[in-house]
């Protein structure tokens, strides 16, 4: 954002987003005069309309699937509308939830593909880092300049950990997706579950079309609504034996959390809805 957006400019973003991204948009970028314009994740018509009507637009930021609802947004639609826009905003995709094995934003026309390297790429919960990919070397050069000045540079040890894990990332992620699929299917019809959110179980035709066009696998993240709300959620977390109650994803251990009081705790109740 700091590389490609300046005070007085805007970016369109799909909502909801990861809690840390929400904090960045509202608590860090906004005071600098960089305005985020939210649109509901999965609403392709609204996405197109908002991009076409927004002035001083520098970026379209798409988090898909959304954290934690797993609602998918149409990357191709965002790219098409951005290319039509007179100001030619960049399209950036936070691909953390799908990772490099399940979804390929650059192949779909996005300018930037963003990852939390802490998750699938590292795979063992023993480092923190981030990765931004781009086809255009000029974009990479601009990002490198900002990174150097802001100090966002990984230490050599973390770089070694990350590069040593990459050869097995596809194998790890494919197994994780298969395991998640089995769990999601086993939970269908459970009397204590109100709703299951998992890409292979989508019933909305629009979501199915997006999934089939841009995802190779359903991924390894499952979200649930439980009868009984927050109380039931915490009782379930306390009762887990194999899953650990912690935030993160993509590592060898299985994790579960209550987003409203963890990753998205800074958001208002209305925002969490």
Where are these regions (language model features)?
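Conserved C-terminal alpha-helix-loop-beta "cap" of PLP-dependent enzymes
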Residues: 193-273
């Amino acid at each position: 954002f700091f590389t490609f957006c300046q005070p007085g400019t805007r970016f369109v973003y799909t909502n909801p987003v990861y809690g840390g991204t929400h904090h960045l948009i509202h608590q860090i970028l906004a005071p600098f005069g960089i305005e985020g314009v939210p649109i509901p994740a999965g609403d392709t018509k609204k996405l197109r309309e908002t991009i076409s009507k927004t002035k001083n637009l520098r970026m379209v930021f798409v988090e898909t699937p959304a954290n934690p609802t797993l609602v998918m947004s149409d990357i191709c639609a965002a790219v098409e509308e951005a290319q039509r826009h007179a100001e030619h905003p960049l399209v950036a995709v936070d691909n953390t939830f799908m990772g490099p094995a399940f979804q390929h934003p650059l192949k779909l026309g996005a300018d930037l593909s963003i990852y939390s390297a802490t998750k699938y790429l590292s795979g063992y919960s023993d480092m923190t880092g981030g990765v931004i990919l781009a086809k255009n070397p000029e974009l990479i050069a601009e990002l490198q300049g900002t990174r150097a000045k802001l100090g966002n540079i990984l230490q050599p040890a973390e770089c070694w950990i990350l590069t040593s894990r990459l050869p097995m990332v596809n194998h790890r992620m494919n197994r994780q997706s298969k395991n998640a699929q089995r769990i999601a299917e086993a939970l269908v019809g459970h009397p204590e579950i109100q709703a299951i959110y998992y890409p292979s179980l989508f019933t909305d035709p629009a979501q199915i079309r997006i999934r089939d066009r841009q995802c190779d696998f359903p991924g390894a993240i499952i979200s649930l609504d439980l009868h009984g709300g927050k109380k039931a959620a915490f009782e379930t977390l306390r009762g887990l034996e194999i899953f650990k109650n912690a935030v993160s994803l993509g590592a060898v251990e299985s994790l579960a959390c209550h987003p409203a009081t963890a990753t998205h705790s800074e958001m208002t109740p209305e925002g969490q809805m």
